[in-house]
């Protein structure tokens, strides 16, 4: 079916209290792996492409591939710009056919973030394109950090209410203690659930967890078994993820887990099939492994069977 807006997918998740995976792509291999998982789990999906992905593959290419896959499928699929840093990136995504955008002006002060976000909403709303924005900064928070330092980094729930009402965004990414990449926590994985609960109570809109990868053991073990070094990487454990969903997270952004899984399998193939010269024999099994990791994740998110 035609691509839908992420709002359409997330409004249902919000109403029924489950989460949908937003999975990052840069190429055909990850895209096909995500679709395989979605078809097999009967789960809606949000395909996310960052500015880096657009630089790597081109917005038109990412759109054409995603649309081709979506048209053949009965699963609801949205194509979303991840961390658009300025209006120009948003316009590039819209022109290519993306159905959803994130404007990430969270590094600016509140008023400037709001001003830029409003501009994006004004452009996107009439086109039926959904808009995500972010408040607070994605930075791991350690236990011994002071209340003032915590407040400086994490979302302020009262500001969130004001921001959502004034901007008209469709969903919000609150900083509650996660960070991007494979190294999220030194000690115990802890998120600020009290803050999350307040943001949900005050805004009622779908909420997004960035930096949500779990660094699942089976993929990280394989990565290291075949010569990789993840240097003690640590993600958001499945039970913490489930709790976050219980308190209002409806979109779970995942890139790092897919990267680790893909390259773990590539490492295995390189180590066990040293004379292989056909890339398809290396990438094929890696795609299947990514699909397995995503299927496991969809069950945790609660989106399996929701398509
Ligand atoms: O949030 C960041 C995503 O993982 C995309 O990463 O900017 O390296 O494409 P990237
Ligand atoms: P991870 O690095 O935890 O996969 O987060 C991805 C993300 O937030 C994309 O926006
Ligand atoms: Zn992110």
Spans of features found by a protein language model:
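A general boundary/transition motif marking the beginning of the first structured unit of a protein
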Residues: 1, 151, 282-285
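Alpha/beta enzyme core
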Residues: 4-12, 16, 27-53, 60-76, ...
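Basic/polar N-terminal segments that are highly enriched at the extreme N-terminus
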Residues: 1-3, 307
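C-terminal alpha-helical cap/extension of soluble enzyme domains
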Residues: 225-230, 236-307
């Amino acid at each position: 079916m035609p691509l839908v807006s992420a709002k359409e997918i997330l409004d249902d998740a919000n109403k029924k209290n489950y989460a949908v995976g937003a999975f990052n792509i840069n190429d055909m291999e990850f895209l096909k792996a995500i679709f395989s998982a979605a078809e097999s789990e009967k789960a809606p999906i949000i395909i996310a492409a960052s500015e880096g992905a657009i630089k790597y593959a081109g917005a038109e290419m990412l759109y054409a591939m995603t649309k081709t896959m979506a048209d053949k499928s009965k699963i609801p699929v949205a194509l979303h710009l991840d961390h658009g840093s300025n209006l120009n990136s948003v316009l590039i995504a819209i022109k290519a056919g993306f159905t959803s955008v994130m404007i990430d002006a969270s590094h600016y002060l509140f008023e400037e973030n709001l001003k830029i976000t409003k501009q994006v909403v004004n452009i996107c709303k009439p086109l039926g394109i959904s808009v995500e924005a972010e408040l607070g900064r994605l930075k791991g928070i350690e236990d011994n950090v002071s209340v003032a330092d915590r407040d400086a980094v994490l979302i302020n729930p009262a500001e969130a209410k004001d921001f959502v009402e004034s901007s008209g965004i469709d969903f919000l990414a609150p900083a509650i203690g996660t960070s991007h990449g494979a190294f999220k926590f030194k000690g115990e994985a802890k998120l600020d659930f009290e803050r999350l609960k307040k943001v949900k109570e005050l805004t009622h809109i779908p909420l997004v967890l960035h930096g949500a990868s779990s660094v699942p053991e089976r993929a990280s073990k394989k990565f290291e078994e075949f010569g990789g070094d993840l240097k003690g990487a640590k993600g958001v454990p499945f039970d913490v993820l489930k709790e976050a969903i219980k308190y209002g997270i409806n979109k779970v952004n995942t890139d790092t887990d897919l990267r680790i899984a893909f390259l773990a399998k590539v490492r295995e193939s390189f180590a066990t099939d040293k004379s292989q010269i056909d890339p398809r024999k290396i990438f094929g099994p890696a795609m299947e492994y990514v699909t397995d990791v995503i299927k496991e994740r969809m069950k945790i998110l609660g989106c399996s069977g929701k398509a």
